[in-house]
Amino acid sequence: RIGRRQRQMCIRDSDGIFSNTKGRPLGMAFDSEENLIIADAVRGLISIDRDGKVKTLSTKSDSDNIPFKFVDDLDIANDGKIYFSDASSKYGYGSDRLELFEHTPNGRLLVYDPATKETTTLLNDLYFANGVALSTDESFVLVNETWMYRIQKYWLKGEKAGTSEVFIENLPGFPDNVSSNKEGIFWVALFNPRNNFVEMSSNKPFLRKIVLRLPELLQPQPIRHSFVLGLDESGKIVHNLQYQSNKAYSPITSVKQYENHLYFGSLTHPGWGKIKVPK
């Protein structure tokens, strides 16, 4: 579980607090040695061992020497390499709206190699690099571009290795996290449906600057809308799960499949959501 304590974020086990990152943990996964690897928006890429000891793995890219500002999500390959996103190299955690309304490509997809302890930038100029997920055979990795309503695909193997292409674009909402069920389906959590004002102001920077000066309560707000898509590994939508209601579990910012259920997480909604995997 993730719990908040005096504005610091703690990893909790069933008996209480297991470890305190003193930052803001977001995406996480266990490596082959049962260390919990965490994309911490404040601390960077970190590792927590079985005893709860926190170790910093990386705080900047060694290939371009640019420090992280907003490490967001990760996935770990069978060879131990950690693929992760830095949502923005300009704005830190809590400044999502600035990144949205400025609409500049400050995000990156990176890889950390535990064998060499080096971090390499794979893709840059992304519009809020968010969720990260490897394909079933690990021939490619996906990274969500939240503010462009699309998902990028970076090839790791084969003739296209080292190149990228759009996996899917023109999504009906803002893609947040993405995960693979390792059976050919990517589950994508959409924070919210597309916003009319964001669409209209996309090529009007002066208007976006005016809105940013307004109190947050007067700025465009998300609606109560649960939204998850299931994509096959060719980028085709095979599941479209939506529910709009004042009682909706929203916003959904992460989704994971475990056996026959989907589990939903949210940055703002207390608790977890759960439904059966649709047929």
Segments (PLM) and residue ranges:
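Blade-edge beta-strand/turn elements of extracellular beta-propeller
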Residues: 12-16, 51-67, 110-131, 152-171, ...
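A short loop-to-beta-strand structural motif that recurs across blades of beta-propeller domains
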Residues: 44-47, 107-110, 150-152, 227-229, ...
